[in-house]
Amino acid sequence: MEEEEVDGIPVNEFGRLEIDFDYGFDFTGIVTPPVSTDYDVTLYAKLGLYCYNFQKGTNLKFVRWEKYNTSTGTAYIDNYITLEAMDPSCNSVFSFQTVFSAAGCYNQDTYHVQDWRVLACRPTCGKSVNEYFDRHEAMDPFYTGKIPKWLSDDALAFDNKKYYVVQESDLHENDWLLVFMEMVFLQENPELKVSPPLEINKVVVETKEDYITEAREKLHAENAIFYISYKYTGVSSSDHKAIIRKTMDGVPEHMSLEIALVK
C-alpha cells in the first residue's frame, strides 16, 4: 500500500502524522493564551501531569499552559500541549509536554462512553511519541470488557475487599480525584469555558485485585474503576453520576480514561 502524506509528512497506520516529538507539538495551528475557551486544555494538561506523577512517584503541580496544537483524524483528536509545571520540593518551574487524545466513543447499553488517552507526558524533550495503545494484549480481561453497571449498596456490602469507599482525607491528599470529576462534567457539558462549582458526594474504587495492607491502596492501582457521584452547586443545582475506568497498557506515559455518564 502506498503511504499517504499530509503536507509532505507520512501518515502512519493509525492515521497520525509520522513526526518527531518537537515537530508534533509545533506542527500547525498553534494556540497561545489568552483565549476564552481554555478550560478544557487546562484539564487535559492536569491529567497529563497526573499520569506522570502516578508513574514516576512525583508531585508536580500545574502552573499554566503555554501553547497547544491539535491533530485530527476520523476517530481521534490529539492535543499537543506545552505547559509550565512546578516541583514543590524545590520550587522549580520547568517546561512540560503532554499529548491528550479524544480517542473515540461507543455506546454500551444505556451508556455513552468516551475514551480519553494520555499518549505522552514528560518534561520537554525531543523523543518521539508512541501513540499505539494496546488495551487487550497488556491487560487483564476484567479491565477490557464492558463498563460495569452502577455499583449498588448491596454489592458494596457483600464484597468490601473488592471496593474502597474514598474518605474525606483521601480527597485532600489526592486532588486528582477532583480533576477526574471535572473531566466527567466537561464531557457532559463540552461548552464549558470556566471551572464549574462542583462537590464530590461519594467515590468508590474497584479493582480485581484485593489490597495487601489497607484498602486505600486501590487509589494507586494502575487499573481501577471509579464510581463517582457529585453535585453541581451552581444555578439549577443537580446531582450527577459517572463511571471512570482507568487503565494503563504498560507503556511509559500511557493512560486511558473511559468515562461513562450514568443517567
Residue ranges and their predicted role:
Residues 1-263:
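N- and C-terminal low-complexity/disordered segments
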